[in-house]
């Protein structure tokens, strides 16, 4: 977790037993080598050389750009490799663009669409509204596939995709990947089963305990639940 967020959490404890300045906390963490180094390793997971249709980018800045003003208007999706002690697993994430909540995830043994679509289906099962929803991703084979697109069609979800190789066109999804891998998934799981347990715990902590600067130090679940108290319907079609 970042120093500013840790500073906020420490200074908002109910018992008020600790009061420390941000700079002092930063220096203290550095002195004891507790600052988490940012990892820059990059592994390509996107295969955009395929025959399937690529949807236009609805989130690209222009006069008709779509902006998420409340939860469950825009979801962003991405896939990242998860190193194991022997080999790798693949983590698929679906995140709400407004609340920053991870609404669906799945750890699979490979990049097959059957694994990636499980995160999307999980997110849809948990959804409690029926308003218009955009699913935004890169133009990788998995997201463009007949299987993945059929879930869009059955549930009335609008599809949006990046229009090139610019990672900034799916920056939020990339950012969530980085948070999980740099703050939570610091050690290599022994195998796929352990990876799934660690990711499950990490997602729960991220959603329910980690404050976000963009959310005025609220957690993603705080923002999402405040929205859900107003709207509670789900018509998911598998």
Regions found by a protein language model. Give the residues of each.
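An active-site-proximal beta-strand-loop segment
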Residues: 63-103, 109-110
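Basic, flexible linker segments flanking DNA-binding modules
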Residues: 1-69, 219-229
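Active-site beta-loop-alpha junctions of metal-dependent nucleic acid enzymes
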Residues: 87, 105-128, 144
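RNase H-like two-metal-ion nuclease catalytic core shared by retroviral integrases
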Residues: 45-48, 137-139, 145-149, 159-181, ...
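Conserved, non-catalytic sequence blocks in retroelement Pol enzymes and Pol-derived host proteins
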Residues: 15-17, 64, 84, 139, ...
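C-terminal domain-tail junction helix/linker
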Residues: 153-157, 179-238
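Mobile genetic element proteins and their domesticated derivatives, centered on retroelements
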Residues: 6, 25, 59, 78, ...
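Short small-residue beta-strand/loop micro-motif enriched in glycine and branched aliphatics
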Residues: 101-105, 159-162, 186-187
């Amino acid at each position: 977790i970042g120093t500013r967020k840790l500073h906020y959490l420490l200074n908002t404890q109910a018992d008020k037993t600790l009061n420390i300045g941000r700079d002092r906390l930063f220096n203290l963490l550095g002195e004891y080598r507790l600052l988490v180094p940012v990892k820059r390793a990059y592994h390509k997971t996107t295969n955009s050389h395929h025959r399937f249709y690529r949807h236009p980018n609805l989130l690209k800045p222009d006069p008709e750009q779509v902006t998420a003003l409340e939860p469950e208007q825009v979801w962003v999706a991405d896939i990242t490799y998860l190193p194991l002690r022997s080999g790798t697993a693949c983590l698929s994430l679906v995140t709400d663009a407004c609340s920053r909540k991870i609404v669906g995830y799945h750890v699979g043994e490979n990049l097959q669409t059957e694994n990636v679509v499980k995160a999307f289906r999980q997110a849809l099962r948990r959804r409690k509204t029926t308003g218009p929803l955009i699913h935004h991703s890169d133009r990788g084979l998995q997201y463009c596939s007949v299987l993945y697109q059929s879930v869009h069609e059955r549930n009335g979800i609008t599809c949006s995709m990046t229009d090139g190789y610019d990672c900034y066109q799916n920056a939020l999804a990339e950012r969530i990947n980085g948070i999980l891998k740099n703050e939570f998934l610091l050690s290599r799981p022994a195998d796929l089963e352990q990876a799934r347990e660690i990711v499950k715990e990490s997602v729960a902590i991220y959603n329910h305990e980690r404050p976000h600067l963009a959310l005025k130090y609220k957690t993603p679940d705080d923002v999402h639940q405040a929205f859900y108290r107003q709207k509670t319907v789900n018509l998911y079609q598998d």
